[in-house]
C-alpha cells in the first residue's frame, strides 16, 4: 500500500526532478512545501497532519510539536544538522531520524575557502571601487603562512583544513571529540584558548549547541582576525561580532547562518561583513546528492 510523505524543504526538486520522481514510485500522496520559505512553527502540525513519513528541512520539530504528530514514524533530513529535532522525544517514541552528512562536505568547504580568499584579498572592495570608477590599489593578504584555527574538525572541518593547507596556511584545530592520532599530522590539535590567541582566520564547523565566540573570546583574538561561520547561527554572539567588526578589531567576516532566518540584523550595515542566505550547500551536485540520499534513507527505513 502506498503511503503519504511530506516534503518541507522549499527548494526540494528544483535542481533535479530525480528525487521527486523516485518518491512518486512509492508514494501516491506527496505534500510539498511551495511557500518558498521555511515552514513556521505555527504551521508545522497542520503540514504534517496524518503523515508517517517526512523529508525534512529546518522546521521546528521540538517535542511540543512532535507530540501532536502521533502517526509520524520516519524523519529523513536533507542536510546534516539535527538541532531542530528533539532527538530524545524521537528516540522515546520510536521515530527514526536520518540525515545526509556526506554530500555537503565539498560544497561547504569550497564556499568557506571562497569567502576566506575574497576577504583576505579584498576582492569585494576592489570590485565595488572599480564599479564606482575608482582605480584604488591597495595591498591585501595571502593565505600563505597564515594561522588558521578551525573549531570543529569533522568531515567539513578536515576538508577545509586540507584546502587551507594547499595555500600554505598553518592549520590548527579544536575538537574535544576527535583524537589527534586519527588526524593527518600536518594539522595541530590545540586547546580552545590557544587557537583563539594565534589565529589570523577562525572558521567554525562545530556541532556544538553552545555559543562559541562572545565578548571574552574576541578579547583574546589578534587584531584584524577574519571570522568565518557556516555552522550554526548561535555559535557567535552577534552583538560582540558587530562591535568588533565596527571597531576593526576583527577585519572582516563571512556569515552564512543566523539565529533568525531570513536575517535582517545589524550586520547588514557593515561593508566588512559578507553575508549569504544559508546557501553553502547550494550547488547543483550537492543539492541533488543530498535530496537523493534523503529519499533513499527514507525508503531504507520503511
Where do the language-model regions lie?
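N-terminal Rossmann-like NAD(P) cofactor-binding module of classical short-chain dehydrogenase/reductase
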Residues: 55, 76, 203
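A short helix->loop->beta-strand "cap" motif at the edges of active sites that frequently abuts
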Residues: 69-74, 93-95, 169, 223-225, ...
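C-terminal helix-to-coil terminal segments
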Residues: 2-4, 14-15, 19, 91, ...
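Glycine-rich Rossmann-fold phosphate-binding loop(s) that bind the pyrophosphate
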Residues: 153-154
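Rossmann-like adenosine-cofactor binding region
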Residues: 63-66, 177-266
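Phosphate-coordination loops involved in phosphoryl transfer and adenosine-cofactor binding
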Residues: 2, 72, 144-147, 224
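Phosphate-binding beta-alpha-beta segment of Rossmann-like dinucleotide-binding domains, i.e.
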Residues: 93-147, 159-162, 166
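N-terminal glycine-/charge-rich "phosphate-binding" loop or analogous flexible N-terminal tail
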Residues: 1-51, 172
Amino acid at each position: 500500500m502506498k503511503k503519504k510523505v511530506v516534503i518541507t524543504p522549499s527548494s526540494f526538486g528544483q535542481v533535479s526532478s530525480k528525487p521527486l520522481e523516485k518518491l512518486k514510485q512509492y508514494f501516491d500522496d506527496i505534500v510539498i512545501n511551495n511557500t518558498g520559505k521555511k515552514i513556521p512553527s505555527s504551521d508545522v502540525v497542520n503540514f504534517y497532519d496524518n503523515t508517517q513519513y517526512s523529508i525534512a528541512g529546518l522546521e521546528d520539530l521540538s517535542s511540543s510539536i512532535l507530540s501532536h504528530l502521533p502517526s509520524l514514524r520516519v524523519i529523513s533530513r536533507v542536510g546534516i544538522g539535527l538541532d531542530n529535532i528533539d532527538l530524545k522525544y524521537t528516540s522515546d517514541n520510536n521515530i527514526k531520524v536520518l540525515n545526509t552528512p556526506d554530500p555537503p562536505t565539498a560544497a561547504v568547504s569550497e564556499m568557506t575557502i571562497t569567502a576566506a580568499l575574497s576577504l583576505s584579498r579584498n576582492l569585494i572592495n576592489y570590485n565595488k571601487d572599480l564599479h564606482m570608477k575608482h582605480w584604488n590599489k591597495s595591498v591585501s593578504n595571502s593565505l600563505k603562512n597564515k594561522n588558521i584555527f578551525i573549531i570543529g574538525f569533522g568531515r567539513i572541518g578536515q576538508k577545509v583544513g586540507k584546502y587551507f593547507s594547499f595555500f600554505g596556511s598553518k592549520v590548527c584545530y579544536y575538537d574535544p571529540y576527535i583524537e589527534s592520532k586519527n588526524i593527518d599530522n600536518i594539522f595541530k590539535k590545540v586547546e580552545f584558548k590557544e587557537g583563539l590567541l594565534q589565529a589570523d582566520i577562525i572558521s567554525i564547523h562545530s556541532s556544538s549547541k553552545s555559543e562559541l565566540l562572545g565578548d571574552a573570546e574576541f578579547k583574546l583574538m589578534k587584531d584584524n582576525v577574519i571570522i568565518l561561520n557556516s555552522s550554526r547561527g548561535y555559535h557567535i554572539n552577534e552583538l560582540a561580532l558587530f562591535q568588533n567588526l565596527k571597531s576593526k578589531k576583527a577585519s572582516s567576516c563571512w556569515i552564512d547562518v543566523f539565529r533568525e532566518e531570513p536575517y535582517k540584523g545589524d550586520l547588514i550595515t557593515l561593508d566588512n561583513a559578507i553575508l549569504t542566505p544559508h546557501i553553502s550547500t547550494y550547488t547543483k551536485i550537492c543539492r541533488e546528492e543530498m535530496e537523493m540520499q534523503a529519499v533513499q534513507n527514507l525508503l531504507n527505513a520503511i
